[in-house]
Amino acid sequence: MTISTQILPLVKEPERLENRLAEIPPEPGVYFMRDNSDRIIYIGKSRKLRSRVRSYFRDGYNKTERIATMVKLVTEIEFIVTDTEAEALALEANLIKQHQPYFNVLLKDDKKYPYLCITWSEDYPRIFITRKRQLGKEKDKFYGPYTDAGLLREIVRICKRIFPQRQRPQPLFKDRPCLNYDLGRCPGVCQKLTSPEEYRKIVQKIAMVFQGRTQELIDILTQQMNAAAENLNFESAARIRDQISGLKSLTADQKVSLPDDTVSRDAIALAANEEHACIQLFQIRAGQLVGRLAFVADAHAELGAILQRALEEHYQTADSVEIPLEILVQHDLPDSDILADVLTQRKGKKVTILTPLRQTKAELIEMVERNAQYELQRMQKFGDRNHQAMQDLAAILDLPDVPHRIEGYDISHIQGSNAVASQVVFIDGLPAKQHYRHYKIKNPTVTAGHSDDFASLAEVIQRRFRKYAEDPQLSRLGNPDWPDLIMIDGGKGQLSSVTAVLQEMNLLEDLRVVSLAKQREEIFLPGESKPSSTDAEQPGVQLLRRLRDEAHRFAVSFHRQQRSDKLKRSRLDEIPGLGHHRQKQLLGHFRSVDYIRQATTPQLAEVPGIGPRLAQEIYDYFHPA
């Protein structure tokens, strides 16, 4: 007889529950709740750990349906004691980001909303728009996410026009500045014609724009302009005057009707349906609306908790000047006093969080809520179209359910040379680029002058699913990496090669595979000699076409990259004594073979690993007598 060692939920073991609760101290800190798989399913904070955790298990405690479900799954409770509530708040935010517990309010990484990044980690910081906040370094600063990408681009364009700044991630030339320097758009950072300290002063002015301190910056520049004019430096005064004019154009028509125009405040509200919550945060400084930020969260929580999570995320990396004196919220926050205390300590002035009930401030919250509602409607309309496409595809292919994860594969080469493959992934009908993969084809029969798409596709599919074939015990159901559908770019031949290799791996019964031919958008199914009878304009077919086109684009871009790298290496391969490592050193230093050819012997010898003798051989190769 097998004895189960599965741990029961604490609610089913009252004695163990009471003992565990008694061990929790009445101090500030963070608590973890785990299920019987030892996964952290919830993380919370409290100024009194014991009373907060005990409240979850108290009869009559007002719990949401989601939290009530969570409590029934808890098998273990852990905690970390902190010195202050502020430390607990910061620790909780970091741990939620790290573990992504299922029952916590989680802000979605919605790449629709862009950020403005300033790379303070570099001596000469860059300023650019990005949707990939997670790639930034510790000292880099992100502002956003912004609801209006067009407006953000316009602000960046104006800032580039009025403040000379670094324009390129890498220098265009090794020994001279580019045209942007001659036009006054860049102070020549590539040749270090300005010091890092002076350049950072320029960037700090731009940062003030995104901190909502435009009027403060205008006042500073006005003083500098007047001082320059008094010193008869009229050229400098005229330049500053133009900067002030450009900044004033940013603040035109941005007035918000409030009785006072001196208090800095943020106003946050949301609109939610059964699945998603769209959150909008308006930043108001000196009576001006200087920023509209947007967040998306799961809606399976109390509305106040969702708002608090968004505020904690937003203010986690905020500077003291970016924290407002007043925060208006649509719903009461569960821990507004803790959040207010933390923000007060960081700002050095009292920060107030309140839910306005009347007059102008309540009207402001209503305006923010209306904007959140419009965004939710737009998201829902797009989501409905997407879901309709997945339902249509499920009907066309007779799938048991709508396909959550779809993978698309394509091959790219030129007559067999540099053959590569792409794997792209759509999750719920949208590209999930973090799951994209590319493959270099290793099949010895695929060489220059001899292509074999059938063998190439078979190789890629075999490599993709090899671990499942080698380990039959490896779970497939519920595995987020297991596709509900595979689409091959091609016709019957390509599909047959893929189904054959899946049959050999004993995986064909567990995977649905189709191919999509280019000419008539025809869908081929395994074992069928003729394509399915479908209309190319059906939503499901259009979804497959988007997947096919994305797989083709990704494969072609990787093929071009491989071909370009090979062309670069092939010329350097002809130089005796210049191995692969030294080639990388040269290309990393000079950026291209053309710049290597233009370099002098002493310049070549400066590269690590390239001595005077090899430098002379490289120079002689490009400059034969």
From Swiss-Prot:
SUPFAM superfamilies: C-terminal UvrC-binding domain of UvrB (SSF46600), GIY-YIG endonuclease (SSF82771), RuvA domain 2-like (SSF47781). Its main location: cytoplasm. Residues 26-105 form the GIY-YIG domain. One of its GO terms (biological process) is SOS response. Keywords: Cytoplasm, DNA damage, DNA excision, DNA repair, Excision nuclease, SOS response. It is found in: Cytoplasm. Pfam families: GIY-YIG (PF01541), HHH_2 (PF12826), UVR (PF02151), UvrC_RNaseH (PF22920), UvrC_RNaseH_dom (PF08459). CDD domains: GIY-YIG_UvrC_Cho. GO terms for cellular component: cytoplasm; excinuclease repair complex. The UvrABC repair system catalyzes the recognition and processing of DNA lesions. UvrC both incises the 5' and 3' sides of the lesion. The N-terminal half is responsible for the 3' incision and the C-terminal half is responsible for the 5' incision. Interacts with UvrB in an incision complex. PANTHER family: UVRABC SYSTEM PROTEIN C (PTHR30562:SF1), UVRC/OXIDOREDUCTASE (PTHR30562). This is UvrABC system protein C. It comes from Nostoc punctiforme (strain ATCC 29133 / PCC 73102). The lineage of its organism: Bacteria, Bacillati, Cyanobacteriota, Cyanophyceae, Nostocales.
